[in-house]
Amino acid sequence: MDVTLAAGSVWTDPACPVARTVDLIGDRWSLMIIRDAMDGATSFTEFHQRLGIARNILTDRLRKLVEHGILDKSAATDGRRHTYRLTEAGQDLFTAVVALRQWGERHAFAPDEPHSILVDDQGRELPELHPLGQDGTPLSAEASHVRKTA
């Protein structure tokens, strides 16, 4: 499923993938909901308890993430509540969330300040993400550029 902008909304910069992504998921609460969905949260109550977000804001962000194709909403087994799960598009955000986390670990904490650590199923810390060129060499912003398409 492709992600879409809500009806009546306009892209900030229609030709830019970064701008479109920010239009879809760039606010603080949406990213935290996506992060917590990746960490196993599936219900309104779980998101609310983990985030401490106002209920009306949580309702709005969950609705938008479902509309945008990031989360799937389905009836819970009790039939009264709903569960939220990442769609394929939502799961594809994992690398972006890891990159944001790793940037935060490097730049948003003092050297000895404690913080959570993302680990794999064996308890090992994830390696640093680095974009690689076609030949396997590391890339930097200086070694790449945006090519505009018609």
What are these regions (language model features)?
Residues 1, 98, 102-150:
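C-terminal regulatory/oligomerization modules of transcriptional regulators
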Residues 1-13:
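N-terminal intrinsically disordered/low-complexity leader segments
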Residues 21, 31, 68, 97-107:
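Alpha-helical linker/hinge and terminal dimerization helices associated
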Residues 26, 77-97:
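Basic, amphipathic "hinge/linker" alpha-helix immediately C-terminal to the N-terminal HTH DNA-binding motif
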Residues 44, 48-75, 80:
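Canonical helix-turn-helix DNA-binding module
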